[in-house]
């Protein structure tokens, strides 16, 4: 699949390929490893100064949510859909409108749901840190508490959905993955064709996007 991008400022048209699955996976893996290293550093520092496990768990959960939100939502929103390793590998996530919202939707089943659930659990464990049976109850498969059962079912459902996303992703090389379809976005690679489009702009209907995207995206020109 290709995306045609028209830049009115330079009067050029760029034809972009949807990214290959292996390139996307490599960028995501490298980005995740980078964040995991930062998270490990935070854990090491927290463990030195804080001995209470519930407090460390809360700090780690909040840190993970903030790091991932900053890196996978805020940074791409401000930097034309790029993260550090997307930029190094020539990738960019194009989003037509409601950028930050659709970036959040794009990451929803990758880490957002897990972050929200574990943040809620971390707060609950911290509030009830004086009760040693709370954490034990969560890992007790015989526990009939409806709240715990609901949380476990929710985590299981999200895990299954994640698996579906991963399987679909493996067969969506140079096409939109499920998270792209949900967020109305395209993960694209370097331009394969750039030409003057001054005359073409006069006869082509375009849809305005954010000014810091590569240009105006001609939806009628999208094709396989």
UniProtKB/Swiss-Prot annotation:
Keywords from the UniProt entry: Cell membrane, Membrane, Transmembrane, Transmembrane helix
Signal peptide start-end: none
Main subcellular localisation: membrane
Membrane topology: Multi-pass membrane protein
Transmembrane segments: 25-45, 56-76, 107-127, 149-169
Localisation: Cell membrane
Domain of life, per lineage: Bacteria
Record-linked Pfam families: RDD
InterPro entries: RDD (IPR010432)
GO cellular component, one term: plasma membrane
Name listed for the protein in its UniProt record: Uncharacterized protein MG243 homolog
Species of the source: Mycoplasma pneumoniae (strain ATCC 29342 / M129 / Subtype 1) (Mycoplasmoides pneumoniae)
């Amino acid at each position: 699949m290709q995306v045609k991008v028209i830049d009115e400022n330079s009067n050029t048209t760029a034809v972009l390929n949807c990214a290959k699955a292996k390139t996307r996976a490599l960028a995501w893996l490298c980005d995740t490893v980078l964040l995991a290293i930062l998270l490990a550093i935070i854990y090491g520092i927290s463990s030195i100064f804080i001995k209470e496990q519930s407090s460390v768990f809360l700090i780690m959960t909040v840190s993970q949510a903030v790091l991932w939100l900053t890196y996978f939502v805020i940074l791409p929103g401000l930097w034309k859909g790029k993260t550090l390793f997307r930029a190094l590998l020539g990738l960019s996530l194009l989003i037509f409108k409601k950028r930050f919202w659709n970036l959040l939707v794009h990451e929803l089943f990758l880490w957002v749901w897990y972050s929200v659930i574990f943040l809620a659990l971390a707060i609950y464990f911290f509030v009830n840190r004086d009760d040693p049976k709370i954490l034990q109850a969560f890992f007790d498969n015989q526990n009939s508490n409806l709240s715990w059962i609901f949380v476990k079912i929710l985590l299981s459902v999200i895990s299954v959905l994640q698996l579906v996303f991963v399987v679909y992703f493996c067969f969506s090389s140079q096409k939109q993955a499920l998270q792209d379809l949900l967020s109305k976005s395209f993960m694209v690679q370097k331009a394969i064709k750039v030409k003057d489009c001054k005359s073409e702009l006069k006869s082509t209907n375009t849809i305005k996007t954010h000014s810091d995207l590569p240009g105006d995206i001609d939806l009628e020109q999208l094709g396989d």
